Amino acid sequence: MTASPCAFPVQFRQPSVSGLSQITSSLYISSGVAANNRLMLSSNRISTVINVSVEVVNALYEDIHYVQVPVADTPTSRLCDFFDPIADHIHSVEMKQGRTLLHCAAGVSRSAALCLAYLMKYHAMSLLDAHTWTKSCRPIIRPNNGFWEQLIHYEFQLFGRNTVHMVSSPVGMIPDIYEKEVRQMIPL
């Protein structure tokens, strides 16, 4: 894995599933509920909130910049149209010493997928490494299979190779990183 994108060593990180999960020194992921918590936003010095949903309405605080990415959490939704623009936006906020919160409804699929795209583009991490890192910071992440297919294509665009592949399983096509888990859940 390349240098860790987080500013502090693994043993000092506190993975969070209900609040804001810190991914890098300037990027966080959360649910829609947490994204509307003024205390959480201010205590983490969030300057930009990116809402990756069609169902969550943000409470608009005047000192925070809001970006709307209206994408449903369905395998056919084209989240890939936002990989570059959102990664670029997160990077530009970081260059201005700001902090970004990416959120969707649960902080599991859409926001996680955009986080993985950002880590690949701006931290030169493979998709596998980006997923491993992000999951260590927010254990509940699990982009839907359509987003995985789009991320796999994006990784190939960026690096000319893939570290994650879609494979056949008893429940259909899944990313190979979930293959062992699925096989343990479903007896053959």
Curated annotation (Swiss-Prot):
Can dephosphorylate single and diphosphorylated synthetic MAPK peptides, with preference for the phosphotyrosine and diphosphorylated forms over phosphothreonine. In vitro, dephosphorylates p-nitrophenyl phosphate (pNPP). GO terms for biological process: dephosphorylation; peptidyl-threonine dephosphorylation; peptidyl-tyrosine dephosphorylation. Residues 95-141 are annotated as: Sufficient for mitochondrial localization. Keywords: Cytoplasm, Hydrolase, Membrane, Mitochondrion, Mitochondrion inner membrane, Nucleus, Protein phosphatase. Pfam families: DSPc. One of its GO terms (cellular component) is cytoplasm. Residues 19-160 form the Tyrosine-protein phosphatase domain. The keyword Membrane applies. It comes from the Eukaryota. The lineage of its organism: Eukaryota, Metazoa, Chordata, Craniata, Vertebrata. Gene3D superfamilies: Protein tyrosine phosphatase superfamily (3.90.190.10). The gene is DUSP18. This is Dual specificity protein phosphatase 18. It is an enzyme of class 3 (hydrolase). It comes from Bos taurus. One of its GO terms (molecular function) is protein tyrosine phosphatase activity. The active site is at 104 (phosphocysteine intermediate). It is a peripheral membrane protein. The keyword Transmembrane helix does not apply. It is found in: Cytoplasm; Nucleus; Mitochondrion inner membrane. Its EC number is 3.1.3.16, 3.1.3.48.
